[in-house]
Amino acid sequence: MKEQTEIGKIKEGRYIVIDEEPCKVVGLATSKPGKHGAAKARIDAVGIFDGVKRSIVSPVSAKTYVPVVERKSGQVISIAGDMAQLMDMKDYSNFEIAIPEDKKGTLEVGKEIMYIESMGKRKLD
């Protein structure tokens, strides 16, 4: 899910959709309006799920999309290799999620963990 907003209203640390991928804004620079042109904004962002750095240059008044990023909790049902099966604590739905390298030794069956969900994708927090 995503919402529409103006480029000028985006701040560092917020989220933005670039190339249909939700990204966290890490850098923001705006130029002054000139004699013949509008102010422009350069946004540098890093993908939430893939870690790829992306940037866009756009007029401040242009519209863009902002993803709805939700932090949820889930209970670990089982662990198989680098995948974990989780159950959402709100609606009790089951799903599989990849385990990042830094979390491999800390996950235990029955333990509650936080995860991020946005635009149909999930990632351990």
From Swiss-Prot:
One term of GO molecular function? RNA binding
Query: Could you tell me where this protein is found in the cell?
Result: Cytoplasm
Keywords carried by this UniProt record: Cytoplasm, Hypusine, Initiation factor, Protein biosynthesis
Q: Does the keyword Cytoplasm apply?
A: yes
Classification via PANTHER family: TRANSLATION INITIATION FACTOR 5A FAMILY MEMBER
Entry GO CC: cytoplasm
Member of which family? Belongs to the eIF-5A family.
GO BP annotations listed: positive regulation of translational elongation; positive regulation of translational termination
Q: What does this protein do?
A: Functions by promoting the formation of the first peptide bond.
Q: What is this protein called?
A: Translation initiation factor 5A
